[in-house]
Curated annotation (Swiss-Prot):
Keyword Magnesium: no
A GO cellular component annotation in the UniProt record: cytosolic small ribosomal subunit
PANTHER family: RIBOSOMAL PROTEIN S15, BACTERIAL AND ORGANELLAR, SMALL RIBOSOMAL SUBUNIT PROTEIN US15M
Name of the protein in question: Small ribosomal subunit protein uS15
CDD domains: Ribosomal_S15p_S13e (cd00353)
Organism: Dictyoglomus thermophilum (strain ATCC 35947 / DSM 3960 / H-6-12)
Function noted in UniProt: One of the primary rRNA binding proteins, it binds directly to 16S rRNA where it helps nucleate assembly of the platform of the 30S subunit by binding and bridging several RNA helices of the 16S rRNA. Forms an intersubunit bridge (bridge B4) with the 23S rRNA of the 50S subunit in the ribosome.
Gene this chain is encoded by: rpsO
Family: Belongs to the universal ribosomal protein uS15 family.
Length: 89
């Protein structure tokens, strides 16, 4: 369920803005999106795992806040990110 160091590293390299970047909104949103996808798959199998469902809802809320921040701060970066992650239709 959790991301390995290698998987985190790949996501950070793909979405970072410069070579030392690991905390920009893009990177944080991409990492949260991957964790959300994995937890969603887990919950499809384990339907009664309510504790994990609460954690999933918290992650979704955190991602929503970061997306809202990025949308207000730089709309072009926001549009590019949601297209790369496939979040909106």
């Amino acid at each position: 369920m959790a991301l390995t160091k290698e998987e985190k590293k790949q996501i950070i390299e793909k979405f970072r803005l410069n070579e030392n970047d690991s905390g920009s909104p893009e990177v944080q949103i991409a990492l949260l999106t991957e964790r959300i996808k994995r937890l969603t798959e887990h919950l499809k199998v384990h339907k009664k795992d309510y504790h994990s469902r609460v954690g999933l809802l918290k992650m979704i809320g955190r991602r929503r806040k970061l997306l809202k921040y990025l949308q207000e701060k730089d709309f072009e970066r926001y549009k590019k990110l949601i297209q790369e992650l496939g979040l909106r239709k």
